[in-house]
């Protein structure tokens, strides 16, 4: 099978970690008789340096023409003072919007080999952590109208948080369908005791839940969710929520596993086109030092195979290869402890690729 992948290596450690994912994908091609064609596009700070914008129109067109997009990371202190309209992160919002990527899937799974790396007590993580946060990506306060006015001599800033019924319904369907493939439970997170947008969210979710009688459904307020993720994360299967709540909760959930470097994510459209990236940032402090953990990016590539290319066997092979590397005691610096074998970013990629 031939597939075209647009590669956005980005800034900081982005090029290093993406190179390891491609190393693994190349082995998949050899083992399963596929052909992946890679097209590189500058994004973020490196694009600002070259072209004055975080992504060019030509680069965006290449993303839209691809079968899937693989992203490293964007941003860094170097670009903190550029105009807000051309900040590196603006490219991500633009790609999500242009590609219609409305659903962000962030699995949080504690690798048993790393259970002692979790900041939670063994009595909590002993029950296992295997949850999926489904976050709405193209609506809410991040895409609402915003303005700064002067009222009675002082500045007043306003951000609008807007959701329509169809936006809530389509992200809800992603969550319910995901739950059917997992443990069959959906928790919808909102702030319906305060926000009108959350009351609409809850009403639409209740109606949608009637179409999925085989899925156990519950409502939970966002502040209680933040607490329950620490108190008893094993209670959750699929969590679905709006853009800002999902942004915050998914970062909280990522640390339950002990390292943000392990976690992948997928941003999906209504077609098979998606963008796949690790959840961590560009880590400019270790860029170019071969110290980054490529596992989150490699697992993101596995999600790409599963969700965009319908290559479940190939995705399983990557996940088994990652588990074997951990079983064999290999650790990058962020997850290293005495008694294990410390390896660099490139070597970890090579080890995982060789396990396929």
Model-derived regions, located:
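Glycine-rich phosphate/diphosphate-binding loop of Rossmann-like nucleotide-binding domains
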Residues: 6-23, 27-29, 151-223, 235
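Buried hydrophobic positions in well-ordered alpha/beta secondary-structure cores of metabolic enzymes
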Residues: 11-14, 67, 134, 175, ...
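N-terminal beta-loop-helix "entrance" segment that forms/cooperates
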Residues: 33-57, 227-229
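N-terminal glycine-rich phosphate/adenylate-binding segment common to multiple enzyme folds
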Residues: 49-158, 244
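Glycine-rich phosphate/pyrophosphate-binding loop and the adjoining helix
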Residues: 138-139, 143-182, 186-188, 192-194, ...
């Amino acid at each position: 099978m031939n597939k075209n992948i647009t590669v956005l290596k980005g800034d900081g450690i982005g090029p290093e970690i993406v190179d390891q994912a491609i190393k693994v994908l190349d082995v998949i091609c050899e083992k399963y008789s596929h052909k992946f064609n890679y097209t590189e596009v500058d994004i973020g700070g490196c694009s600002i340096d070259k072209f004055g914008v975080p992504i060019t129109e030509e680069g965006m067109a290449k993303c839209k023409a691809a079968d899937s997009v693989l992203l490293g990371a964007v941003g860094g202190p170097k670009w903190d003072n550029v105009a807000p309209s051309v900040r590196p992160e603006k490219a991500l919002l633009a790609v999500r919007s242009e590609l219609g990527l409305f659903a962000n899937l962030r699995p949080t799974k504690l690798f048993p080999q790393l259970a002692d790396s979790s900041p939670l007590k063994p009595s909590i993580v002993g029950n296992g952590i295997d949850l999926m946060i489904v976050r709405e990506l193209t609506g809410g306060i991040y895409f609402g109208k915003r303005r700064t006015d002067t009222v009675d001599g002082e500045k007043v800033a306003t951000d609008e948080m807007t959701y329509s019924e169809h936006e809530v319904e389509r992200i809800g369907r992603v969550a319910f369908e995901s739950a059917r493939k997992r443990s069959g439970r959906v928790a919808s997170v909102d702030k319906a005791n305060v926000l009108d947008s959350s009351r609409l969210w809850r009403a639409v979710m209740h109606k949608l839940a009637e179409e999925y009688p085989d899925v156990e459904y519950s409502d939970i307020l966002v502040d209680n969710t933040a607490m329950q993720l620490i108190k008893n994360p094993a209670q959750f299967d699929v969590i679905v929520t709006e853009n800002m709540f999902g942004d915050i909760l998914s970062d909280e959930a990522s640390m339950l596993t002990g390292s943000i470097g392990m976690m992948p994510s997928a941003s999906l459209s209504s077609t098979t086109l998606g963008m796949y990236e690790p959840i961590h940032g560009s880590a400019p402090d270790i860029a170019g030092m071969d110290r980054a953990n490529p596992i989150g990016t490699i697992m993101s590539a596995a999600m790409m195979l599963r969700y965009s290319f319908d290559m479940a066997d190939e995705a399983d092979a990557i996940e088994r290869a990652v588990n074997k590397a951990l079983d064999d005691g290999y650790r990058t610096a962020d997850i290293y402890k005495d008694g294990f074998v410390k390896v660099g970013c490139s070597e970890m990629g090579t080890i995982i690729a060789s396990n396929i």
